[in-house]
Regions:
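Conserved GNAT acetyl-CoA-binding A-motif
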Residues: 119, 126-138
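Acetyl-CoA-dependent GNAT
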Residues: 51-107, 180-182
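Conserved beta-strand-loop-alpha-helix junction that forms the acyl-donor binding cleft
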Residues: 110, 136-146
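A short beta-loop-alpha structural element at the N-terminal edge
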Residues: 21-33
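C-terminal "cap" of GNAT-fold acetyltransferases
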Residues: 162-188
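Conserved catalytic-core motifs of GNAT/GCN5-like acyltransferases
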Residues: 135-138, 150-172
Length: 188
């Protein structure tokens, strides 16, 4: 169950074009809006997503089985329409101190600062969950996204050759980036 501080999280962010977007955690009632949002996704964007978001059953499953102990999904709304999705994935066992960040923005909401603001919100939420490290996997050709994560303090830890396979079987390299969340003892 979500702690109250996360469950009640709401943040209105201002984009570069002065538009306002609301960030809040996903709830079960977002199913139809998510189906609408992902129905617009096509082409290259589909290749990089972890799930078949065009299948309404996938979205329905997400909404019906929300488990904040495994995934904390954060949505961005422009009025009543979802324009971006970010998620914080939790691990168990020896990786329980690590969270993984994933992010997807509608094409019209890229290059306006929304992605950085959403990842910042996930960083804050991860700290509230007392995680030690955040990680992100980004295809090496996504240089602008890599730079955006670097601007937030993420560092490249490794490049994984042929780590990501597109639907056509084409292999791509991925950079593994991490952000330490706990202050070192010499910091104050």
């Amino acid at each position: 169950m979500l702690p109250e501080q996360i469950k009640n999280f709401r943040e209105m962010v201002t984009l570069k074009d002065k538009a306002y977007v609301l960030l809040r955690p996903m709830v079960r009632e977002d199913e139809s809006r998510l189906i609408e949002f992902y129905s617009m996704v096509g082409g290259d964007d589909l290749c990089y997503l972890h799930h078949d978001v065009k299948d309404p059953a996938v979205i329905r499953d997400w909404c019906e089985h929300l488990d904040s102990g495994k995934v904390l999904p954060l949505l961005a709304f422009d009025h009543e329409h979802i324009v971006a999705s970010a998620s914080l994935h939790f691990y168990e066992g020896p990786k329980r101190h690590i969270g993984e960040v994933r992010l997807f923005l509608a094409r019209d909401y890229r290059k306006c600062g929304l992605g950085v603001k959403m990842v910042r919100a996930l960083i804050d939420l991860a700290r509230k969950q007392e995680l030690s490290i955040l990680m992100a996997e980004i295809a090496t050709e996504e240089t602008k996204m890599i730079k955006a994560f670097e601007s937030l303090g993420f560092k490249t830890q490794a490049t994984l050759d042929d780590y990501f396979m597109l639907p056509d079987g084409d292999l791509h390299d991925v950079v593994l980036m991490t952000l330490p969340l706990r202050m070192q003892t010499e910091e104050f």
